Amino acid sequence: MYDSEARQKTLNLTVSAVFVAILLLEAFIPNVGYITILPGLPAITTIPLTVAVFASLRGPKAGAAFGLVWGLTSLLRAYAAPNGLVTILLFQNPLIALLPRLAAGWAAGLAGQLADKWESRKPLAYALSGLLASAVNTLMVILLSDLVYFSHPQKLALALGAKSGQSLLVILFTALAVNGILEAVFSGLITPLITAPLKKRLKRR
């Protein structure tokens, strides 16, 4: 029994190390994890897919920790290699950079756990995990940004290319929702294709 537990711990550590390495590559190699479509606006990211797969394999607690690592890379990129003023204004704030990513990993892990209950609908659970990893992150970034800049929205609104007088919340949804929808669809479609066979493979070890 001890050997079995030790093997499982070793496997968990190995899986975690591999996924952290993948996340770092996505975060810091240009156009791998972040793809800039419109200059000045936040890039579309494929990282929610990685978060969803990991969280589905390891559960909500590990998913939240992995999401926090993602948030830390976002914070670091905002200072070291921002792709525009919007990235600086949003993700140099630790609250906006960290909390949505942490929550995304946790939510994706909860959805991934449903696969154990939905034996005949496991792909649906993994698809939900992918959708949530992206949707929770996008929604929380929008809401927290509105909260942080509620009393002084002008600079962020102008950086997003909006006209004066518009609601900041509406501006944020307009600017970021398209990215969020694309990310959610991508993650929702691809997560089951990766997670299901990978989980079977890991169970055999």
Regions found by a protein language model. Give the residues of each.
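Loop-helix junctions at membrane interfaces
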Residues: M1-R205
